[in-house]
Amino acid sequence: MRILLLLLLSPGFLLAQTKKAIDRKKSTITYSMNHLLHAWDGTSADLNGAVQLKADGSIEKVAIVSKVSAFDSKSSNRDAHLLEVVEALKFPNISFYSTSITAAKDGTLDVKGVLQFHGVNKETAFKATTKNLNGTTQVTGNFIFLLEDFKIERPSFMLKPVDNEVKVKFDVFY
């Protein structure tokens, strides 16, 4: 009973925080890759995640995960090969969780966190933008990662490997 009373009276408990699930019907993450002969995108609309808000409604923390197999590049052969290359059976998810989020008055966010992919945790930082839309909040942004940072051997086509750089764009609603 004393412990419960101490928890209830602690300053951290008094700070109101709200946790919201991301809107799985609207949220997407898209990767873009390039090869000497062509470029393509793959999109996942199968995201799980949560956003923790501070008392003032600003974002305090975020965590998002997607199955690697959920990304669709509109080419089943390319998607199947990508699943082999990234060892999706061994590492089925790609995820991000924030370690710090700093909000500016103009709606932009400086986000730092950890991208988990292919069994590797990599610190990353990017800018994002928030927009309030009739009771829903949209967060958009982009960042770049390198395949070699996640110990992924670059696939080749016609003896030429794909570019090392992967561009990621996200559009998350909550």
What kind of feature is each model-predicted range?
Residues 1-19:
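Bacterial Sec-dependent N-terminal signal peptides
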Residues 17-174:
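Low-complexity, acidic/polar, glycine-enriched regions of mature
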